[in-house]
Amino acid sequence: MASSVFSRFSIYFCVLLLCHGSMAQLFNPSTNPWHSPRQGSFRECRFDRLQAFEPLRKVRSEAGVTEYFDEKNELFQCTGTFVIRRVIQPQGLLVPRYTNIPGVVYIIQGRGSMGLTFPGCPATYQQQFQQFSSQGQSQSQKFRDEHQKIHQFRQGDIVALPAGVAHWFYNDGDAPIVAVYVYDVNNNANQLEPRQKEFLLAGNNNRAQQQQVYGSSIEQHSGQNIFSGFGVEMLSEALGINAVAAKRLQSQNDQRGEIIHVKNGLQLLKPTLTQQQEQAQAQDQYQQVQYSERQQTSSRWNGLEENFCTIKVRVNIENPSRADSYNPRAGRITSVNSQKFPILNLIQMSATRVNLYQNAILSPFWNVNAHSLVYMIQGRSRVQVVSNFGKTVFDGVLRPGQLLIIPQHYAVLKKAEREGCQYIAIKTNANAFVSHLAGKNSVFRALPVDVVANAYRISREQARSLKNNRGEEHGAFTPRFQQQYYPGLSNESESETSE
């Protein structure tokens, strides 16, 4: 008897260890912010000339359009990223699908509902329908539907899309939804070839509906859904349906594309706005407590506090109250990483939203541990990017709808035009951070005065001014800044520097 109990306990303990290890690897692939579990570039890369990108090809559907950026361009291949922009019209449904690589979605405008179907999670949403026959209400029939959680999203939301997890989006608003998707091709979750593959569960991408915007040849992403590849007989047997229904699943004669129009709208069970806010607040508090406990007890996240079924999949980054840095005369900066948004541990990406006021300037910086994909939402910004050779690899104005890839460690300087600017930067690390050259907590502030004075051949007084000119400003700087000392940085150092 004792032997039997011990045997059962041993099996249970082994299973627990296996689950612990797998969940830890899944949700915490890297605890070191200086290291990213990406596979790296698949080729030797030279970032000696950057450019602002716009979508290269469009695929039109019944209720929307998907626009593809040029994935064959060297900059996308070297950074291991893939980008699309998607527009979903009111009552438009982006049919369920999954991809081989993880990504994040930024909602530029609009609102709607979405679902992520995590494998093995229970159907916690239940609703009843009443269906009437053509003969009248006397023969009405009630049926019950159960499904996984439905999430509401709105403008300014960041949505996480794990690899291999089916998802759908629906526009239940009055205006089109515009969203930009950024995928990480080099993520270790991808064990296929180094490119994005989309597996449709319904609908299709019709090749005849494709339209190249600028005439260049890029990779085709058209195809049928996965059911079209199965035999009708085996499919009908596996799903317990007849052959006619099986053929409908294959969508062989469906010309609506991947974004379809729902004539009378979807009947979805959704929590009220108050319930959503209460749930989000409780979830945020729970995650902060869990993160604090993890920091106190262990540097590693064991993966058991959070799982697929309860993890938060969206967060709003546009809310001014969430800003990490705010200057009333210059603008605000808001970032989300895996500490604020734990599912990013699985995605291994993060995001920063910047709102610069008229003529405001961003402190020069470089991305320490990630590439950055900057998408201009509104306004315009002058951007300069410098390589390790001190060469200007980009100097231009970034306009709404344009995308700029900034390689890791390349120095960046940005200044808003007269109308100001707003942009989102998606980064290839779950805990991306930057190193600023000026302002509070900057490189200059951290250097000793004598190091600065001798390095640039300036006086100690000038070095002190260089270190402290921006006072307590951090990130976004006020425009038309007045110099606090006379020009002379290019002159020979004064005798004070050699004392």
Swiss-Prot record:
Q: Where is the signal peptide?
A: 1-24
Task: Kindly indicate whether the keyword Disulfide bond belongs to this entry.
Answer: yes
Q: List the disulfide bonds.
A: C45-C78, C121-C309
Keyword Disulfide bond belongs to the record: yes
Which InterPro entries does this entry report, sorted A to Z?
Answer: 11S_seedstore_CS (IPR022379), 11S_seedstore_pln (IPR006044), Cupin_1 (IPR006045), RmlC-like_jellyroll (IPR014710), RmlC_Cupin_sf (IPR011051), Seed_Storage-Functional (IPR050253)
**What keywords are annotated for this sequence in UniProt?**
Disulfide bond, Seed storage protein, Signal, Storage protein
Lineage top rank: taxon:
Eukaryota
Q: Where is the Cupin type-1 domain?
A: 50-247, 315-464
Q: Which Pfam families match?
A: Cupin_1
| Region described as Disordered: spans on this chain | 467-499
GO terms in the biological process aspect are: seed development
Q: Name one GO molecular function term.
A: nutrient reservoir activity
Q: Which family does it belong to?
A: Belongs to the 11S seed storage protein (globulins) family.
What task does this protein carry out? Seed storage protein.
What does the annotation say about its assembly with partners?
Hexamer; each subunit is composed of an acidic and a basic chain derived from a single precursor and linked by a disulfide bond.
Protein name, UniProt field: Glutelin type-B 1
The source organism is Oryza sativa subsp. japonica
